[in-house]
């Protein structure tokens, strides 16, 4: 409901995983990629597509505030090689984190021009966020999003549930653990 109400979307072009991207090059003259964790192979599956492997050379390719979500190289030798070739086809590259610039240059050894840009969530005005806060529904549950799950993080959430006497609703990239359903 949040996404439908607050994030206007264009017509859906494709869906991952296993999507066929072959017709996209015929429809667009510019493709922009960028998001949290978008260049993190651990979470994307088929990382080459996020480096626009499907786009032919006439397409302008832009990375806007792309994120690796880590300062460590998680690329296999093959992914590093393939994505290193693909990133050189970009017309402009910006990343969210300063550590991403170091990752690109010092660990992945990709020789490309890259700049750091502001996280897009910081582009909103405070009034945009205030309007969202007014829509919050209190249902006496703890919502938890854990990106990199660990025993310590799960243990912390369980302790928090006990202290607050509220059930937790936890979502992770690998699926959903809805203990309160």
Where are these regions (language model features)?
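Aromatic- and Gly/Pro-rich donor/ligand-binding loops
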Residues: 1-85, 155
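Alpha-helix capping/helix-boundary segments
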Residues: 38, 99-100
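Acidic anion/phosphate-binding donor-loop and adjacent secondary structure
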Residues: 72-77, 122-135
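A short beta-strand/loop micro-motif in the catalytic core of glycosyltransferases
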Residues: 90-97
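Helix-loop-beta element that forms the nucleotide-linked donor phosphate-binding surface
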Residues: 101-121
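Donor nucleotide-activated moiety binding/catalytic core segment of transferases
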Residues: 114-121, 126, 176-181
């Amino acid at each position: 409901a949040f996404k439908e109400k607050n994030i206007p979307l264009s017509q859906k072009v494709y869906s991952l995983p296993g999507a066929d991207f072959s017709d996209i090059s015929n429809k667009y003259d510019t493709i922009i990629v960028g998001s949290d964790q978008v260049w993190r192979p651990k979470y994307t599956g088929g990382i080459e597509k996020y480096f626009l492997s499907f786009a032919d050379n006439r397409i302008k390719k832009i990375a806007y505030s792309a994120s690796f979500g880590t300062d460590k190289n998680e690329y296999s030798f093959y992914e590093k090689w393939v994505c290193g070739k693909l990133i050189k086809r970009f017309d402009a590259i910006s990343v969210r984190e300063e550590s991403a610039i170091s990752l690109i240059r010092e660990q992945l050894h990709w020789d490309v021009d890259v700049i750091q840009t502001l996280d897009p969530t910081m582009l909103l005005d405070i009034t945009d966020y205030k309007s969202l806060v007014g829509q919050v529904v209190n249902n006496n549950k703890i919502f938890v999003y854990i990106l990199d799950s660990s025993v310590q993080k799960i243990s912390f959430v369980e302790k928090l549930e006990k202290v607050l006497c509220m059930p937790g609703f936890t979502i992770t990239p690998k699926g959903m653990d809805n203990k309160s359903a």
